[in-house]
Amino acid sequence: MELYLDTANVAEVERLARIFPIAGVTTNPSIIAASKESIWEVLPRLQKAIGDEGILFAQTMSRDAQGMVEEAKRLRDAIPGIVVKIPVTSEGLAAIKILKKEGITTLGTAVYSAAQGLLAALAGAKYVAPYVNRVDAQGGDGIRTVQELQTLLEMHAPESMVLAASFKTPRQALDCLLAGCESITLPLDVAQQMLNTPAVESAIEKFEHDWNAAFGTTHL
């Protein structure tokens, strides 16, 4: 199982990388734009924050296959080992096929159906990212989409893996993992929600109170 943070906030990546067993960081054009930093400046900083073994993802902006391929090569040249995110459109599928032959690892993104995700995997994408909450918002079932896609990949494209995205709650993320999803990427607020459990703090305070009452200290 691989856990990623979905952000371009370098300071938060540095903070949470010390706590979470993260495999890397995912970004998209909206996330990069929100950072107000040039992609060519923020990507190296993110890579440094996650270390050489961390996996970094960045997305192309072009709408045609050739443009996607050219941008993917620029990203690869800037950050060796980067995974390039390609929207799963007709042109995106063509680009994924070309990039597979070029040896550039891709993730098929903006996936709203299991069929769409399977096509990305068959085209050569190593990762496929279904948008869980966005599927729900359109009246679909995001978790079921993940389940169906996971089953399809196991049967027909075992070299590819689901990297589920678009979460609003920790429950959605856990349900994805229970559905057999192999990797997820969490926005900062959802990652933080996993840590912020009031009952835990209350339990710790009770331990400290009892220990201090007995021994006059809160240390061993």
Swiss-Prot record:
Keyword field: Carbohydrate metabolism, Cytoplasm, Lyase, Schiff base
EC code(s) of this entry: 4.1.2.-
Gene Ontology cellular component terms for the protein in this record: cytoplasm
InterPro entries tied to this protein: Aldolase_TIM, F6P_aldolase, TAL/FSA, Transaldolase_3B/F6P_aldolase, Transaldolase_AS, TSA/FSA_arc/bac
GO terms for biological process, alphabetical: fructose metabolic process; ketone catabolic process
Keyword Cell wall biogenesis/degradation: no
Catalytic residues, chain numbering: K85 (schiff-base intermediate with substrate)
Gene3D superfamilies reported in the protein's UniProt record: Aldolase class I
Reactions catalysed: beta-D-fructose 6-phosphate = dihydroxyacetone + D-glyceraldehyde 3-phosphate
EC primary class: lyase
GO MF annotations in UniProt: fructose 6-phosphate aldolase activity
Domain of life, source organism: Bacteria
Temperature sensitivity of activity: Is not thermally stable at temperatures higher than 60 degrees Celsius. Is less thermostable than the isozyme FsaA.
Main location: cytoplasm
pH dependence: Optimum pH is 8.5 for the retroaldol activity on F6P.
Keyword Lyase (UniProt): yes
Subcellular compartments: Cytoplasm
Function, as annotated: Catalyzes the reversible formation of fructose 6-phosphate from dihydroxyacetone and D-glyceraldehyde 3-phosphate via an aldolization reaction. Can utilize hydroxyacetone as an alternative donor substrate. Is also able to catalyze the direct self-aldol addition of glycolaldehyde. Is less catalytically efficient than the isozyme FsaA. Does not display transaldolase activity.
Subunit structure: Homodecamer.
Family: Belongs to the transaldolase family. Type 3A subfamily.
Name the record gives this protein: Fructose-6-phosphate aldolase 2
Encoding gene (name): fsaB
